């Protein structure tokens, strides 16, 4: 059951074994691993930003937000056309109608298209109307029988730490202070809540670029430095 299709970026070697030659370089060439990590950082953090840059005078705002965004759209649309050239019925359902980078782009090595084209898989885009004793009924009236239903309905992105109740100095409630607008310094610390450090906190979510692993490491470095300052002073 699909509410909104995703854009897919072709990554042929995704989850593949690291080649022996590169493994040798990691082991024997000084600082090669550090250089490669820096290259990955640049490639995944800085390079994609141009793709999301909005050109105010761009004439095709119904499909993209600028020339680089349009280029990426053509690249990914071509990938989908190639993957589903034998299934035009699916191609119509998987092409998004919004600009790339408006939602997270999925990295794909061909597994997702191959899964959708299996004989025992059916992609339903008709909105869900209700859950029934036998499965799911869509808005068009069709009932789809199911033994197991997995709810992938999204996230309450601004309700951090829910359902926990967190109280700070003077008994102030964290969610009442935020009042639906979660904010934190560097996404980590919050006024009136001493000794509270957040990981993956407000406004640190990534959509266009970056690695949550790297961002988490930066947050841990900041938190450890803060704890050291507290202990030493």
How would you label these PLM feature ranges?
Residues 1-233:
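N-terminal FAD-binding dinucleotide-binding subdomain shared by FAD-dependent oxidases/monooxygenases
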């Amino acid at each position: 059951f699909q509410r909104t299709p995703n854009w897919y970026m072709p990554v042929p070697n995704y989850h593949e074994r690291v080649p022996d030659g590169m493994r040798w370089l990691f082991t024997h060439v000084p600082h090669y691993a550090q250089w490669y990590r820096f290259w990955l950082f640049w490639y995944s953090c800085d390079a994609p930003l141009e793709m999301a840059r909005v050109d105010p005078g761009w004439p095709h705002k119904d499909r993209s937000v600028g020339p680089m965004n349009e280029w990426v759209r053509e690249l990914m649309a071509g990938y989908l056309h190639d993957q589903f050239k034998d299934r035009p019925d699916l191609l119509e359902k998987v092409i998004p109608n919004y600009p790339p980078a408006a939602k997270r782009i999925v990295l794909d090595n061909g597994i997702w298209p191959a899964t959708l084209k299996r004989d025992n898989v059916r992609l339903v885009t008709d909105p869900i109307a209700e859950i029934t004793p036998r499965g799911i009924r869509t808005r068009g009236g069709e009932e789809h029988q199911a033994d197991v239903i997995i709810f992938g309905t999204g996230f309450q992105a601004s309700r951090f730490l829910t359902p926990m109740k967190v109280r700070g100095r003077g008994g102030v409630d964290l969610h009442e202070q935020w009042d639906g607008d979660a904010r934190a310094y560097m996404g980590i610390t919050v006024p009136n809540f001493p000794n509270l450090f957040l990981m993956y906190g407000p406004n640190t979510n990534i959509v266009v670029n970056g690695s949550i692993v790297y961002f988490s490491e930066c947050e841990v470095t900041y938190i450890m430095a803060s704890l050291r300052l507290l202990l030493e002073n």
